[in-house]
């Protein structure tokens, strides 16, 4: 495909430029192909922290099922508020790289940056190198995930196979 991973590193290299404070590696998936089950146990973007894990099913790139729990209903209500079915489309896969950040539900940027987390974004991904347009973008963060892509383990219990944490102050 023509999809390439990107990295948000929170660093500014040029005067007058702006950067996200996020520290993550991400890739926009090919639209309409993502299929699987997400057990959401971290945070729901602007909604906040998840009180108990929610099962979410994705088929052919779109959310098809959200477990009927209090948090599940909040998520459904939030997505429905966009009045845009394209907000249900998988748009980003990301892995947090910041060993200082924590997933607390107070700031979605910090949540998705926390080392050992995985997030899946839904909706628009044009700025990430994808081709999907929607009325917004929304990330769901999960703790200590196991990620399997094409029968290859990318991350096991929050430990990425190719990414190791940097101990700050050692550099």
PLM feature spans:
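Active-site bordering "gate/hinge" segments
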Residues: 1-52, 59, 74, 84, ...
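Active-site and channel-lining beta-strand-loop segments
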Residues: 52-66, 146-147
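Short, glycine-/Ser/Thr-/acidic-enriched flexible segments
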Residues: 43-45, 62-63, 70-71, 98-101, ...
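Long, Lys/Arg- and hydrophobic-enriched amphipathic alpha-helices
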Residues: 126-171
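Cysteine/selenocysteine-centered motifs that mediate thiol-based redox chemistry or coordinate metal-sulfur cofactors
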Residues: 86-144
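C-terminal, non-catalytic macromolecule-binding modules
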Residues: 62-96, 102
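Short, solvent-exposed amphipathic alpha-helical segments in soluble enzyme
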Residues: 54-57, 73, 80-84, 109-111, ...
């Amino acid at each position: 495909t023509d999809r390439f991973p990107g990295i948000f590193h929170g660093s500014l290299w040029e005067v007058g430029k702006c950067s996200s404070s996020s520290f993550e590696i991400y890739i926009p998936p090919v639209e309409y192909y993502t299929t699987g089950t997400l057990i959401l146990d971290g945070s729901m973007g602007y909604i906040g922290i998840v009180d108990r894990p929610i099962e979410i099913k994705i088929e052919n790139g779109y959310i098809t099922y959200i477990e009927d729990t209090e948090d599940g209903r909040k998520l459904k209500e939030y997505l429905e508020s966009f009045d845009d079915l394209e907000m249900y489309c998988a748009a980003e896969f990301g892995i947090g790289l910041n060993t200082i950040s924590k997933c607390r539900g107070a700031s979605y940027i910090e949540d998705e940056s926390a080392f050992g987390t995985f997030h899946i974004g839904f909706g628009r991904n044009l700025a990430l190198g994808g081709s999907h347009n929607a009325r917004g973008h929304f990330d769901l963060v999960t703790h200590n995930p196991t990620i399997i892509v094409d029968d290859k383990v990318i991350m096991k219990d929050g430990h990425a196979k190719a990414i190791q944490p940097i101990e700050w102050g050692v550099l």
